[in-house]
Amino acid sequence: GMSGPCVVLISDGQHQFVDYQACSDYRQLSGAELIDKIRQAGIAGLGGAGFPTAIKLDPRNTSIDTLILNGTECEPYITADDRLMQDYASDVVAGAELLAFILGEPSSIIVGIEDNKPDAIKAMQAAAKNTRVKIVSFPTKYPSGGERQLIQILTNKEVPSGKLPATLGIVMQNVGTAMAAYRAVRFGEALTWRITTLVGEALKVERNIK
């Protein structure tokens, strides 16, 4: 076989967090500085793909007019994003505002949520009051949580085959990703936790855990 570089990581066993570098007013920083904070915190897409968020927030030479947060979670049995939006609605909305600032304040900021999540919708509507963030619910139908499908549902635009949403002036992030980005910038938190759903016959109690 072919040889290649190898990196060996050896833990010191101390389990110590780095010192948090909080930022009380991110609007005093440039978009590039904020993207770097998000990169250094290891924020990646929490909708499943795990794509680095910093890269997605830097659509070079492209003007973004629509930011979409995906709160659809259309897969069966999974309710982690539903729980997240109920318990951390204000952080999700703050994350939407942060991402919009980084992207140059797009004219439209939308959070898309399927209508089978009434408690999450109510919490998000309350948190988004007096902001530019618009909460949009729509009929529950798989696979509406897919990036291209959700874009078509919310904007009536179809992303061409082989193209990225940014070519239409659209950036989409998961609701959990938006919250993680906000907490990385505001509190200096690295991405070390998330809410996830545990289900199955082997469990006495099926639940969401943090």
PLM region spans:
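Short coil/turn connectors at secondary-structure junctions
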Residues: 3-5, 33-34, 40-41, 62-65, ...
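Short, charged, surface-exposed secondary-structure boundary motifs
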Residues: 18-19, 78, 144-149
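Histidine-anchored nucleotide/phosphate-binding helix
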Residues: 86-102
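Mobile "lid/hinge" segments at catalytic clefts and subdomain interfaces of large enzymes
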Residues: 58, 69-73, 181
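Acidic low-complexity segments
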Residues: 2-46, 51, 61, 118-119
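Gly-rich Lys/Arg/Thr-decorated short loops/hinges at beta-loop-alpha junctions or inter-strand turns
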Residues: 16, 67-81, 202
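Flexible glycine-/small-residue-rich
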Residues: 9-13, 71, 137, 200
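Hydrophobic alpha-helical positions that pack around
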Residues: 106, 110-210
